[in-house]
């Protein structure tokens, strides 16, 4: 559960936000932020996964009782890891995290497909993009 103090800070933030978290709290912080955006703010969004395959992220979110139907995923891991890729309406698979052009195109398509005014774009890791 996101703390009252952190919730207040999130509410006060501007339209564009970059948050950083320490490694030991990374997984929990990601889930708390997605839960906050989908349940309290009630915004749909795009989740760009650069560290874990879509199926793993989807399972983690569902285990935390997060409705993944309001999230479009961009998976830049599964192909690189040799995982099985099946066409899924809510997930766009990208060749690798290093393919920034494909990630950018996929983000544009995903964000454009969300008709709501308020939406979020979430990267599970920016460090991976620096490789």
Give residue ranges: language-model regions.
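Phosphate-binding/switch loop-helix module in NTP-utilizing enzymes
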Residues: 81-131
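A structural signal for isolated positions on well-ordered beta-strands in alpha/beta enzyme cores
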Residues: 46, 72, 120-122
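Nucleotide-state-sensitive switch-loop elements of NTP-binding domains
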Residues: 5, 64-94
